[in-house]
Amino acid sequence: MTTTLTTDLNADAGESFGHWPLGDDARLFPLLTSVNLALGFHAGDPVTLHSAVRLARQHGLGIGAHPGYPDLVGFGRRELALTPLEIQAATLYQIGALQAFLTVEGGTLQHVKAHGALYMRIHEDRAAGEAFCHAVQQLVPQAYLIVLAGAAGSDLALTAAAHGLRVRREAFPERAYTGDGRLASRQLPGSSIHDPAEAARRAVGMAQGWVQTLGGERLALEMDTLCIHGDNPQAVAIAGAIRAALAENGVTLARLHD
């Protein structure tokens, strides 16, 4: 019997701000199955968010909220000393903004995924993770919560489950992994991958259940969705290469599902 492999392909997007464009959503969205939309705190603005919701709906994408720290200058990738209460409120506020546009456009929220430094913090800081999960459970309990694939996501997955949330695991074909299955620091040489062919090769491996680490080892990695970063200058080329490579290796792309 042949086993059919299926995965979701998502990207962080909707990140333009006013007169300053970032990424190429018009060319990227047709290549995806899901999208994580910036909500104005780390990137994006109301007009960009509304336009991104419309574009995602046109292409039948699963739409996800991508809340981050209130840090436009640092693109949400710097740690901020927000309290758990502030994290909960900021998460509710940002998801609420997306919910408004989804209501207007007749869409539904598929998932929630934290951005940047907040994403890392809720995986490592239990109180922060509790606050984030509580906000999601309060407002959109039907949405999937995205966590890191591998050991790095295990604690947050347990916290999410305790709040009655459904978890989906995410892997990054254009990011390097350490020997313990965690994302390599962006400060390390080779931590970010810009070659579409290499990202595609890694995506196929991830769909098959493994990832090659910085040290060259092959590590088991179970995941449900692949993520690329829309601010990567090669994002469109990477997404296209991944789609082609997955198809060539018998992997079907589909939105997140039970």
Swiss-Prot record:
What InterPro entries does this protein's entry cite? Answer: Glyco_hydro/deAcase_b/a-brl (IPR011330), LamB/YcsF/PxpA-like (IPR005501)
The molecular function terms of the Gene Ontology recorded here are: 5-oxoprolinase (ATP-hydrolyzing) activity; ATP binding
Keywords (alphabetical) are: ATP-binding, Hydrolase, Nucleotide-binding
The EC number of this protein is 3.5.2.9
Q: Name one Pfam family in it.
A: LamB_YcsF
Which Gene3D superfamilies does the protein's record reference? Glycoside hydrolase/deacetylase
Record-level GO BP terms: carbohydrate metabolic process
CDD domains per record: LamB_YcsF_like
Q: Which reaction does it catalyse?
A: 5-oxo-L-proline + ATP + 2 H2O = L-glutamate + ADP + phosphate + H(+)
User: Would you identify the family this protein belongs to, as annotated?
Assistant: Belongs to the LamB/PxpA family.
According to the record's subunit comment, the protein's assembly and interactions are: Forms a complex composed of PxpA, PxpB and PxpC.
Q: PANTHER family per the record?
A: 5-OXOPROLINASE SUBUNIT A, UNCHARACTERIZED PROTEIN YBGL-RELATED
Main function: Catalyzes the cleavage of 5-oxoproline to form L-glutamate coupled to the hydrolysis of ATP to ADP and inorganic phosphate.
The protein depicted here goes by the name 5-oxoprolinase subunit A
Organism of origin is Deinococcus radiodurans (strain ATCC 13939 / DSM 20539 / JCM 16871 / CCUG 27074 / LMG 4051 / NBRC 15346 / NCIMB 9279 / VKM B-1422 / R1)
